[in-house]
């Protein structure tokens, strides 16, 4: 494939403006899409961007995690809020974090008092707040309070014992073996089944029990050592580790909701739906952190649910959860995982989503896995997270692997579920070597994939002692780029405004499962500017119109569907209709890129064409208030110069999000993009 021309050296801005023309100086959350912000205006015959672009609302601001990680004071909270606002940041997530003194415990009166002060101060400043539902994470235990209220709500797991090798009178995984070689479960331990392995005929006992103390914990809010110094190696210092809750148990989750969500409402209800926009739940995980060896996620009565969900008796296949040499072990593990995810939807996400809907706030945050699109149907603001350098500029991870699907996962869910916003928590644990350029690249990587609410991880209340090394870096007031932050924050507001209350113009979809989104065909589409959305398979049997012309859902019309993963049975009737109409593209590893693109182009004419070709250019086309916008991002490391032909014709206005500058783009003028640069082309006077 021919790359677009690489322009060596730094691009001169005057030369750039000469190529493109003359420079001109320049609400409600939960629920369905609305339209506001105005359309492009004529000023003395000149087309200008709408007011929503020039002066975007604070509602589209970055909303950083604000790590409350040291002794708090009202004076310092107010000072930091003023600093946020002065730098263009109008929203924040109150995130209690490791380093808090013990007298500010999770949901304690002092913590609630400081939260109330921060919320009231935000209201006075026309800022907005997201509350965080755990101390610290993953969500579901209220910092151990769920288990403290009822020990039966501790995380549970399944354990296996090979009865042919276990010695009589011994203890295996906490389960006693009788003199006759049979298991003797204690109180709180339940024998699920004794089945024979298909591989060698051994008898396997499967028992469910609570995870032992010290395992399946969450990260806590207080350092183990009182006021520890920073370590010489800059490693994190130990914090307390409260026990995780059983998020597969609906009663445990109901307790969690009462202790956290209802408490928030009781304390701050006058601000719900106003200053308090949402509550953030963070990657609820079956076994929380530090899982006990040999444990498989489960809970009391889980086998009955698994059998009902799968439609067959799973009991004979239980050994496959531990032994990979059992016949079709991977298949049965996938089936069990799908059943667990279904259970989690019912016990956790559905309960919390219903509570949020009834109390006027949005459920925001993200599930545990990057392609868990199924759980996002329960979020009023579907979201995902980029942490631990899972995605990096110049690395294959931007296009390959499960993590590469996460931005499209959330934005596709937003579209198909009729939501208004989708979010991403990003930059967390990228390390002290993280740069402002990397942060901008990640932002643009998300924006061009449809994200419109960004939660930077994080702004640190304090960097005293070891706090500076807790999942670094600080990407706000304690960063080296804070003085340069305002133009960046303003650009994010413009781009999030653009991606909100707009229609994504795209006629290609890639089929996904509730817990798996394929990336290989997606990579080809990205590199050839064929935009797409992920369509979760169950939509095909729930809320789509499928006929010989394609798929219609939530205002979208997909004329082609790429199928890479094996679809579920319920989706096959709809897929048969599409296949007979010639609108199904079955991708496999033997299909080369040109064949895939040829099949796409026969069904969906290319919306944009780039000459010379460039695999580093990403394009998103949206319609907002009657105007067409093309978001164009150079995801690569080279300066690029190329001609961009769009299917929509008219006067082209080039918008610079950083400086609110716009220029007329001459019809034959090439587009020049520096590495990691993003521009927006508005089509006016069509």
Annotated model-derived regions:
Residues 9, 31-47, 630:
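C-terminal segment of N-terminal export signals and the immediately downstream linker at the start
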Residues 49-80:
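Mature N-terminal segment immediately following signal peptide/propeptide cleavage
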């Amino acid at each position: 494939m021919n790359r677009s021309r690489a322009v060596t050296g730094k691009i001169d801005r005057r030369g750039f403006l000469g190529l493109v023309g003359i420079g001109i100086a320049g609400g409600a959350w939960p629920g369905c899409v609305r339209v506001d912000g105005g359309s492009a205006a004529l000023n003395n015959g000149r087309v200008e961007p709408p007011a929503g672009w020039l002066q975007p609302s604070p509602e589209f601001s970055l909303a950083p995690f604000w790590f409350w990680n040291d002794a708090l004071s009202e004076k310092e909270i107010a000072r930091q809020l003023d600093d946020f606002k002065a730098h263009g940041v109008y929203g924040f997530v109150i995130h209690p974090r490791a380093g808090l003194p013990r007298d500010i415990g999770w949901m304690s009166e002092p913590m609630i008092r400081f939260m109330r002060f921060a919320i009231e101060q935000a209201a006075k400043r026309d800022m907005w707040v997201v509350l965080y539902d755990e101390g610290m994470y993953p969500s579901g235990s209220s910092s151990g309070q769920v288990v403290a209220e009822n020990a039966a709500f501790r995380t549970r797991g399944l354990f296996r014992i090979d009865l042919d090798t276990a010695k009589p009178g011994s203890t295996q995984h906490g389960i006693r073996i009788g003199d006759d070689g049979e298991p003797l479960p204690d109180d709180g331990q339940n024998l699920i089944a004794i089945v024979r392995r298909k591989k060698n005929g051994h008898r396997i006992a499967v028992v469910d029990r609570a995870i032992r103390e010290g395992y399946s914990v969450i990260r806590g809010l207080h350092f183990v050592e009182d006021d520890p110094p920073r370590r010489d190696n800059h490693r994190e210092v130990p914090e307390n580790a409260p026990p995780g809750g059983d998020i597969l148990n609906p009663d445990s989750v109901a307790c969690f909701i009462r202790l956290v969500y209802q408490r928030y409402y009781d304390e701050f209800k006058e601000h719900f739906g106003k200053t308090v926009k949402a509550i953030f739940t963070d990657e609820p995980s079956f076994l929380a952190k530090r899982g006990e060896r040999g444990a498989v996620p489960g809970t009391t009565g889980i086998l009955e649910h698994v059998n009902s969900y799968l439609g067959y008796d799973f009991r004979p296949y239980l050994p496959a959860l531990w032994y990979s040499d059992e016949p079709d072990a991977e298949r049965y593990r996938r089936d069990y995982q799908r059943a667990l995810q279904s259970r989690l939807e019912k016990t956790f996400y559905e309960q919390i989503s219903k509570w949020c809907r009834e109390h006027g706030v949005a459920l925001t945050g993200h599930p545990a896995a990057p392609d868990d699109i199924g759980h996002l149907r329960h979020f009023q603001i579907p979201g995902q997270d980029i942490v631990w350098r899972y995605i990096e500029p110049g690395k294959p991870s931007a296009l390959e692997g499960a993590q590469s699907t996460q931005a499209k996962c959330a934005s596709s869910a937003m579209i198909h579920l009729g939501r208004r916003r989708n979010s991403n928590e990003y930059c967390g644990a990228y390390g002290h070597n993280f740069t402002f350029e990397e942060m901008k690249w990640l932002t643009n990587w998300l924006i061009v994939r449809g994200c419109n609410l960004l939660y930077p991880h994080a702004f640190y209340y304090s960097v005293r002692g070891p706090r500076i090394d807790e999942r670094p870096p600080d990407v706000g007031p304690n960063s080296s780029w804070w003085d340069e932050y305002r133009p960046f924050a303003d650009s994010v507001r413009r781009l999030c405004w653009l991606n909100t209350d707009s229609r994504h113009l795209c006629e290609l979809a890639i089929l996904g499962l509730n817990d798996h989104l394929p990336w290989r065909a997606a990579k080809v589409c990205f590199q050839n500017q064929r935009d797409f959305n992920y369509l979760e398979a169950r939509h095909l049997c729930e809320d789509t119109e499928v006929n010989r012309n394609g798929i219609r859902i939530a205002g979208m019309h997909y004329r082609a569907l790429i199928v890479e993963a094996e679809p579920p049975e319920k989706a096959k009737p709809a897929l048969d209709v599409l296949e007979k109409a010639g609108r199904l593209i079955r991708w496999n590893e033997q299909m080369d890129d040109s064949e895939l693109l040829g099949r796409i182009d026969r069904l969906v004419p290319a919306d944009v064409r780039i000459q010379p070709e460039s695999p580093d250019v990403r394009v998103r086309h949206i319609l907002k208030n009657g105007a067409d916008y093309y978001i164009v991002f150079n995801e690569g490391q080279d300066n690029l110069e190329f001609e961009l032909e769009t299917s929509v014709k008219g006067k082209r206005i080039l918008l610079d999000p950083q400086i609110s500058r716009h220029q007329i783009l001459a019809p034959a003028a090439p587009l020049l993009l520096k590495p990691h640069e993003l521009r927006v082309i508005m089509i006016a006077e069509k």
